[in-house]
A protein has these predicted regions:
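A domain-level signal for caspase-like cysteine endopeptidase catalytic cores
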Residues: 2-85
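Short, solvent-exposed loop/turn and secondary-structure capping segments
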Residues: 26-28, 100-104, 146
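Catalytic-core segments of thiol-dependent peptidases
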Residues: 49-142, 231
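Ordered hydrophobic segments in well-structured contexts
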Residues: 14-15, 60-63, 90, 210-212, ...
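Active-site-proximal C-terminal subdomain of hydrolase catalytic domains
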Residues: 131-235
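Short, surface-exposed linear patches
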Residues: 36-39, 87, 111-114, 155-159, ...
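Residues in intrinsically disordered, low-complexity segments of regulatory proteins
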Residues: 31, 38, 91, 195-196, ...
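Flexible, glycine-rich phosphate/dinucleotide-binding loops
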Residues: 22-23, 98, 141, 164
Length: 235
């Protein structure tokens, strides 16, 4: 190590990819109602971040919403933040297999974005400093290993359509931001969602309702972390 290199840990930043679109799976809606749902859900998510103290606990919070919810803007934001911070990423958007749904449902964040980030990370891991990814996107598990390949230490995802964005988000944020391990925060949020929705959903025959199965969150990673854990790095 040269005298000019610092051993101090980097501060932690949070990047939020926020785009609801106003879409509800399988339900056709008029445009005005989609716009209302889009605005309401996005403002609700930002309120939760303030309520549970994300802006106090993170050194920097960047929210990509509306026209900024695109692949190029997401990549640029992650790379810019990584210059000075280790980055946690919160995905509050819809998704398909291997894809995040961006601005107005017309911007898709998929192979092109991830391939570009992978090239940069493979050339110089220090340029993309991801720590944990938490997502509510449908088919999020299809992207979980991609995030690990980009250097993240833990990620989550649903195998299919995620029908339960709430209370999943609020329970996760409450646990994660008060210092619970990532895996515990994800597990508690998933259990809370299951308990709440099981009051309304009945599959019959002793089987789990397909929405419960589809929405189940899986955690993958190389280690568990808390909000205050310094990212472990290969020597």
């Amino acid at each position: 190590m040269t005298p000019t290199q610092s051993t101090r840990p980097k501060p932690i930043a949070l990047v939020v990819f926020l785009e609801n679109v106003g879409h509800i799976a399988g339900v056709p809606l008029p445009r005005w109602m989609m716009a209302m749902i889009d605005w309401t859900t996005e403002e609700y998510a930002k309120l939760l971040l303030h309520l549970y103290g994300a802006h106090r606990r993170y050194s920097r919070v960047t929210i990509l919403e509306d026209a900024d919810a695109t692949g190029p803007k997401l990549a640029a934001s992650l790379l810019h933040a990584s210059k000075t911070h280790t980055v946690d990423l919160l995905l509050l958007a819809h998704g398909h297999e291997g894809v995040l749904v961006g601005h107005r449902g017309r911007e898709m964040v998929g192979a092109e974005t991830f391939a570009a980030l992978q090239r940069i990370y493979d050339e110089s891991p220090a340029k993309l400093d991801l720590r944990v990814i938490y997502g509510l996107n449908c088919y999020g598990l299809s992207l979980a290993w991609q995030w690990l390949a980009l250097g993240a230490q833990a990620a989550n995802g649903a195998a299919g359509v995620n029908w339960f964005p709430e209370p999943s988000l609020s329970v996760f944020l409450r646990n994660w931001l008060r210092g619970e391990p990532y895996s515990v925060a994800v597990q508690r949020s998933n259990l809370a969602a299951d308990r709440w929705w099981l009051k309304l959903l009945r599959a019959g025959g002793g089987r789990e309702h397909p929405w419960i199965v589809s929405s189940r969150q899986v955690v993958v990673g190389v280690c568990d972390v808390t909000l205050h854990t310094e990212k472990t790095r290969e020597s």
